[in-house]
Design a protein with these regions (language model features):
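Terminal targeting signals and extreme-terminal segments of soluble enzymes
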Residues: 1-275
Length: 275
């Protein structure tokens, strides 16, 4: 098998940007990460973050990222404005705007900072789970983007064709191992996308498809570049759940840990659903 390294991996091709002027990049959306409506939201979020990561004025590393999916992203070319709104001694605030045909399709803000060594503590431990290699990979072909990820479910598999006689689950929680497929060394861009691999919580709660999608997400990065490098291309353990689904909208809270138990990402999002 050909080794997948950054730049020849499908993910890196999907988030690739070309500088086109001050605070401006250009890119292209193909169908390799296509979802129900437009591309997988995680790769769109990674594209916007990449604009800040590639910017010549960037300082520090990502601490938080908020993405708002304003409208459908179409196949084809786009422009990305990555604007450093304010740069302080060790912090930086960003405005990110993805545009197609002159209209904003995705907006975002990001907070970067230079981390200083301090006292640290992790209060949310990784749940107990069988090793990733002991679980079968779930092959899913409903959407193009599924092929780009390795999913190994511990619990909470969404299966609309289940035959256990239960039409619904009692909760919305999912616990799974996941990573890029083929494996790719973890970095901030790929962690951004992995933070959005969880299907809408209403799918899991009710075990059936319904029109649904993320409207806004916020990632909190708990790791630095060195910690991500230590995670390598191994699986991450992800846990996601909803706290309330009400009148067309649902939240989701999720976490991703490295296989040695380090919490790398906390993410929250709001999704719409229709009936």
């Amino acid at each position: 098998m050909t080794e997948a390294t950054p730049h020849n991996h499908a993910f890196d091709r999907a988030i690739a940007l070309t500088a086109a002027g001050p605070n401006l990049f250009k890119g292209n959306v193909d169908d390799s990460f296509q979802n129900m409506v437009g591309p997988f939201g995680g790769v769109t979020a990674a594209i916007l973050l990449n604009g800040a990561l590639q910017h010549p004025e960037r300082i520090g590393e990502p601490i938080s990222l908020t993405i708002n999916f304003a409208g459908p992203v179409q196949l084809g070319d786009f422009e990305l404005e990555a604007i450093p709104l304010r740069t302080n001694r060790s912090t930086q605030h960003w405005l990110l705007l993805q545009k197609q045909n002159g209209e904003v399709v995705t907006s975002g803000t990001a907070f970067f900072a230079t981390r200083r060594e301090t006292w640290s503590e992790q209060q949310h431990d990784m749940p107990a789970a069988p090793a990733a290699d002991s679980l079968p990979r779930v092959e899913r072909g409903e959407r193009n983007w599924f092929r780009n990820y390795d999913f190994r479910y511990v619990s909470g598999l969404f299966d609309p064709n289940r035959s256990d006689g239960n039409p619904e689950d009692a909760h919305s929680e999912t616990l799974l191992w996941t990573r890029d497929n083929p494996p790719r060394p973890l970095d901030f861009a790929s962690l951004t996308a992995l933070g959005d691999v969880f299907a809408p919580r209403i799918f899991h709660r009710r075990q059936r498809f319904t029109p649904a999608g993320t409207v806004s997400l916020t990632h909190y990065f708990h790791a630095d570049t060195d910690q991500l490098a230590r995670a390598g291309d191994r699986h991450l353990l992800g846990q996601a759940r909803a706290t309330r689904m009400h009148n067309n909208y649902s939240d989701q809270i999720a976490h991703l840990w490295s296989d040695d138990g380090q919490l790398l990402l906390t993410t929250t999002q709001v999704a719409y659903f229709k009936e």
